[in-house]
Amino acid sequence: SRQNTYVFSEKHVRLFWKTRTCFSKDFSYLCPMEKTKRYYEYGKFLQERFDHKVQKISINAGFTCPNRDGAKGWGGCTYCNNQTFSPEYCHTEKSVTEQLEEGVRFFSRKYPDMRYLAYFQAYTNTYDRLDSLIRKYEEALAYPGVEGLIVGTRPDCMPEGLLDYFAELSQRKFVMIEYGLESTLDKTLVRINRGHTHEESESAIRRTAAKGIYTGAHLILGLPGESRDEILHHADVLSRLPITTLKLHQ
């Protein structure tokens, strides 16, 4: 199906769709200046929405996950190690404002006029009381130069009241919700201790997109036990979902 879905990595796209594609083979109608590419780059997605450079600033707001605290399991996902992708300044003893200050200080050296998106990245960033969540989001939005939020979360941790908040916020700020799907196969989700089903993933994506919110999905390629055909089948499944962006990990 023809969807305006943006992806993060050419290498991952080539691997994922080596023998098939979930999009039309002719992308010229979507991207006339990029005829050699069969996907939209994430950078282009941002360029089309901002008239200036924007940079994500990662934040560790001190959240946990339901498969870490006993609500759905213990220990978290089998592969989880947030330290592998968290910047040095992301420490929970620092406030949201302090983490933004350090991130902005780093990037503003090269691009003084840069604007920013607060990226709530570590663990499940919608897994707390609604008032506590909104307070942290609003703290980030109040920081000078921050023009929106990107919130990483699980598909089983998006209450309707929070979706309503994001829907209202998206009318005046950039808002994207990124869901960790990781796999479209329930047997794999059990194996890696995710604690949710693919049906829950599809439901969360459709509910979020239906409210007009930019909706992203994360997928891991090469999880234990998945065959090549099963990995390629992820493309067929995801192409039927109303996602805005897709990030592929391996």
What are these regions (language model features)?
Residues 199-250:
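Conserved C-terminal portion of the radical SAM core fold
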Residues 5-7, 13:
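Short hydrophobic alpha-helical segments enriched in small aliphatic residues
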Residues 83-103, 107, 111-130, 145-158, ...:
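Core AdoMet radical
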Residues 107-111, 136-144, 166-174, 206-210:
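Acidic (Asp/Glu)-rich catalytic clusters
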Residues 33-76, 81-117:
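N-terminal [4Fe-4S]-dependent radical SAM core
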